Amino acid sequence: MKTTSSYAVELKRTSKIFHPTIKIYQRAVSFCVSTFDSEWSAIGSLTGKSRNNYAESLIHSTSKNQAKYSEFDKQFPKLPSYLRRSVISVALGHLQSYYSNLENWLNSKQTTKKPVLQMNLNKLPTFYKDNTYDCSLMDADSVSLKLFVNNDW
């Protein structure tokens, strides 16, 4: 396996182009944390892929499924499916951790503060090869990312 390090690569100061994508991603994560928390009694008993699929069916409408919380599709129109699934995984992982910490706290002597569910997380989207970026379109030193720019992906 070939490992690539980017310590010696100078990045241009163009991070502002990432801000709209990051802002949308973080708002979507907050929405999902809040929504999934209200449905945790049903979601918490599921595991793995069935948990993710159920969570996605709650927020995303398809031709075969009417979402219970259709506001997600209205607030985040045209959100790419890989980002939506990443948002769902991050939100579910955050809630799983919170409820695990809460259970541990309840089973302990409760000498520390009760865990608090954070709704606004500073999470960043992960750009996976073939899904969110393409190396084949450019030279060896470039990457083409799929970002939210000018109100479109």
Question: Model-predicted segments: where are they?
Answer:
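Nucleic-acid substrate recognition interfaces
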Residues: 1-153
